Amino acid sequence: MSEVFAAIGRKQLAHLDMWLENRRKNAQRFTSILETHQALTAPSVRPKTKHAWHQYCIKSDSPEQFIEHMGSHAIAARLVYPTPCHQHPVYSEHAQAKATFPITENLSKQLVSIPVHHGLTEEEVIRIIEALRSYS
């Protein structure tokens, strides 16, 4: 890392707690909508932990339809990990490359990420919430 990037990073660290708190608030608002949703499953957080919410991953049995729906509301949504780690070329020489991991392989096709970052405006959060509510 260059000195310039290190200096920028050090300056940004002063904002980290606020950014994480904003992400947590956004995630909680999305989770409260999804707790009773019939077609989507919210991510869970273990008790006594604090999630950083780098990604907000929603499980959908129809991810393409969900991504299209969110896109129709001008919300970026995408498959989070379309290729499971053990299937990446870099692991082709490892023993796991030939193994099957059915849960991992299934989830890689179902987990969709939506914006949760600290810079979302109130209007954007409301638009995401409305899009989540209207999806069936």
Q: Which ranges hold each PLM region?
A:
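PLP-dependent aminotransferase class I/II
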Residues: 1-136
